[in-house]
């Protein structure tokens, strides 16, 4: 089943010049980039994107990090795109859970600075794509 997912290359991935490597892995997996944009994230967009974490102790640091530098936002499409990208990304803890061969396993340094975000469900993908690409 063809799906769409939101992929973010977070500020640490942009700063470490891993954008080309990450996009290359997405394309080699057979997924298609249907929208791509480099942007600075506003506090408002960050708060909406991470709304499910509001009230948690790490919420403020999430917002601070995602707004700390440019982010590459992309809509990625393909068969089972959500699961396919999450497999490419690897576990959220790059040291303990992300295996070598995944983006986080190969390049991640710590849990908060884990390079990429990918939607975790069809519902999340629709909501997140609507936030980041309202005209899509």
UniProtKB/Swiss-Prot annotation:
UniProt subcellular location: Cytoplasm
Xref: SMART domains: NDK (SM00562)
Positions contributing to ATP binding: 10, 58, 86, 92, 104, 114
InterPro entries noted in UniProt: NDK-like_dom, NDK-like_dom_sf, Nucleoside_diP_kinase, Nucleoside_diP_kinase_AS
EC number, as in UniProt: 2.7.4.6
This protein's UniProt keywords: ATP-binding, Cytoplasm, Kinase, Magnesium, Metal-binding, Nucleotide metabolism, Nucleotide-binding, Phosphoprotein, Transferase
Annotated catalysed reactions: a 2'-deoxyribonucleoside 5'-diphosphate + ATP = a 2'-deoxyribonucleoside 5'-triphosphate + ADP; a ribonucleoside 5'-diphosphate + ATP = a ribonucleoside 5'-triphosphate + ADP
GO molecular function, one term: nucleoside diphosphate kinase activity
Gene Ontology cellular-component annotations: cytoplasm
Main location as per UniProt: cytoplasm
Pfam families listed in its UniProt record: NDK
One GO-annotated biological process of the protein: UTP biosynthetic process
Broad EC category: transferase
The protein's required cofactors: Mg(2+)
Record: active site: 117 (pros-phosphohistidine intermediate)
NCBIfam families assigned to the protein according to its UniProt record, in alphabetical order: PRK00668.1 (NF001908)
Subunit structure: Homotetramer.
Task of the protein: Major role in the synthesis of nucleoside triphosphates other than ATP. The ATP gamma phosphate is transferred to the NDP beta phosphate via a ping-pong mechanism, using a phosphorylated active-site intermediate.
Stated family: Belongs to the NDK family.
Protein name listed in UniProt: Nucleoside diphosphate kinase
Species this protein is from: Mycolicibacterium paratuberculosis (strain ATCC BAA-968 / K-10)
